[in-house]
């Protein structure tokens, strides 16, 4: 009868020593050493074929593996230089000839600081537009919606397990 194996149970030393493959039990220690030596020889022959000597970890990279600096430059085929010549026009032209948009003469020294003058102008503009948000205090009563009138015939309530009107 097979025993159930607990996967959290630590195996005993005896079960660890048993080989999993039954054919592996027939290999002696001398055979293992011979196989290891054969693998080492094959690795040495392969490294000699590739031109590397010794351990691959200790090898320095070859100088011919580095790409030449001239090959790293990417040419600008079909692109003009970013510098603008005098005959070229800029991408965006700003017209500053018209002073109609913003009059700076109003903000000159007229007794008010520029911040006060801008604040007055903003208040005037808000009054012209019909917004008096800065002058009207926030009233919480304005935010509430009054309840609708309830007619006495539509009043139904639940009392002591019975619906009543």
Swiss-Prot record:
Residues 1-114 are annotated as: Disordered. Residues 32-44 have a biased composition (Basic and acidic residues). Residues 49-63 have a biased composition (Polar residues). InterPro entries: FAM219. Residues 105-114 have a biased composition (Low complexity). The modification Phosphothreonine is found at residue 96. Keywords: Acetylation, Phosphoprotein. Belongs to the FAM219 family. This is Protein FAM219A. It comes from Macaca fascicularis.
